[in-house]
Amino acid sequence: MESVEPPVKDGILYQQHVKFGKKCWRKVWALLYAGGPSGVARLESWDVRDGGLGPAGDRSTGPSRRGERRVIRLADCVSVLPADGESCPRDTGAFLITTTERSHLLAAQHRQSWVDPICQLAFPGTGECSSGSGQAESPKRGFVPMEENSIYSSWQEVTEFPVIVQRTEATSRCQLKGPYLLVLGQDDIQLRETSKPQACFSWPYRFLRKYGSDKGVFSFEAGRRCDSGEGLFAFSSPRAPDICGVVAAAIARQRERLPELAMSPPCPLPRALSLPSLEPPGELREVAPGFELPTPRKLPLTDPGPQSLPLLLSPTQEGPASGLYASVCKQTSKHTGTAEHLYENVCMLEASPGLTNGGPEAQEGPPGGRSPLGSPIYHNTEDLSWPGSAQDSNLEAQYRRLLELELDEAGSAGRSGAQAGIKAKLVTLLTRERKKGPAPCDRP
């Protein structure tokens, strides 16, 4: 049934809506009604179809020509602000009506002719429209000389703001609806009822994930550790930017009080009481039977020169003797300190009292198993078996070839006959040692 009360204002408006994820403007016929015995103050609108609705005095068209009816209760309005930054149809100006439920973006050819009556009906007794509409007409009233207020209190000292809760998933879960008082403390945000001083909910600043304000709505995202649980909370207020500024200042002050949160120095590592020793003292360890701890071999220091040294046996030998290498050095006429070594795996011999040169007293040398430059003996820790006849022929052929090359080199360089005699004795010695064969031993 059509309303019989006359509207305060009617005409064509454009309302923004989202269709398939795209913002578009819809042309509507709007009627602005004042509150009275027959109804509340409201703004009604219909979609314009088939030529649209005529003026208020000529509304004889039937209901078939009207689209969906939309009603905005002016008693639920929080703010009515111009929206200059929004793109709107040609030759129109946009304005935003924010209510407790949602926001409505409208556009009209004469924006101020709609904003003024809406503000007078939505905010009765104020004598002027909400912030923005009065500022739009202030230049037309002329310049008024003003003086600075020396006792002006900045907005940072204001900590209480009247707000209206916007409907979100988090506010619905917490059963928040209607007007409240938002109190901004030094450490948290508190929401109180207008008639009770007790706080309904509190959100510490350190538990807020995000916060901000847009189009007269202050919102923040609470974390899991808040009393209300995580979620988005939105509050409508004409001073939403001021609320956001107070929150930002409080967070900055809290960060200054806790400098370790902004920049925490790295924790130093514990300082060592003493440097590690290069040669740690001996330790007593329990080992399994048959296991030998690796120990550095002490090698003797001898003069370089052509010589054949006795075999080096382990002083703690329990099984077969380890295979050793006898080294033969060749002394050159120019470089007396450089030795070229030839190696032969001689045999495995048992301990003999005749080996006095290789005793433990004569085997003191640098630790680590490395032989010095003048030492012609290299110890082999592995247990090597005596080579077979095929290996003997290969070794003999290799050594003979090496000796022939050495003799040729010595002859070309004009070496003395004494050195050639030493080479011949060396061949005889190696042949005799090979014919002796390995000492008999019993292997498991």
Curated annotation (Swiss-Prot):
Protein's membrane topology: Peripheral membrane protein
Sites of Phosphoserine modification: 138, 274, 308, 314, 371
Presence of keyword Ion transport: no
Region described as Disordered: spans on this chain: 278-299, 354-390
The IRS-type PTB domain, residue ranges: 157-261
One Gene Ontology term from the biological process aspect of the record: Ras protein signal transduction
Keywords in alphabetical order: Cell membrane, Cytoplasm, Membrane, Phosphoprotein
Broad class of the protein's primary localization: cytoplasm
Outcome reported for the amino acid change (mutating residue 224 to A): Greatly reduced ABL1-binding; reduced tyrosine phosphorylation
Annotated Low complexity bias: 358-376
Posttranslational modification: Constitutively tyrosine-phosphorylated.
Family of this protein: Belongs to the DOK family. Type A subfamily.
Protein name per Swiss-Prot or TrEMBL: Docking protein 3
Organism: Mus musculus (Mouse)
Gene behind the chain: Dok3
